Structures are given as structure tokens and as C-alpha cells.
Amino acid sequence: MPRYTEVRADGFVFLFAHDDDAPELLHIYARHLTTIEDALRVWFDSNVEDIWDKEHNRFEVQNDTHLLLWNWLTVGERVLIISCMTRED
């Protein structure tokens, strides 16, 4: 089982980690019941702004429904999706 699933969208490569306890599932689904589509919807939402979380060395971005935690692996190209959750979580 691969550690990450790679998804290409609009010139970026997104890496989604598989869950440690359930490696057949993505972490975002196993822990928060969110999907790749949910994460990409937040990422590409032109009405949101990325905020740098200095304490945790990651970016946060949220729309009306979800919070996305992410960081660059290669600036402008490769994105590590740390987590994605509904705002109710």
C-alpha cells in the first residue's frame, strides 16, 4: 500500500497521506470523512485566503464548509495535504 496518493489538478501535484491505522483509506477520510474533492474545492476556492500558521509550520485555508491544512513540498508545484475537515469538527 502506498504511503501517499498523488492527484494532479490544474498544474499542481497534491499528496494525500494514507491513514496509519487504516492504510487502505486516506487520512482525511479515515479521520474526518472528507474526500479529495472536498480538499481540492477548498484549495481552488478563489474567495478564500491562505493563512500561515507559524506555530505548526503549515498553511490553513477555510471556506464556508471545510478547513484545509497544507504545506508546499515544492513551492508552486507539489502540495502536501496535511488534513481536511468540516468546520464542525
Please name every model-derived segment.
Residues 1-89:
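Ribonuclease/tRNase effector modules and their secretory precursors
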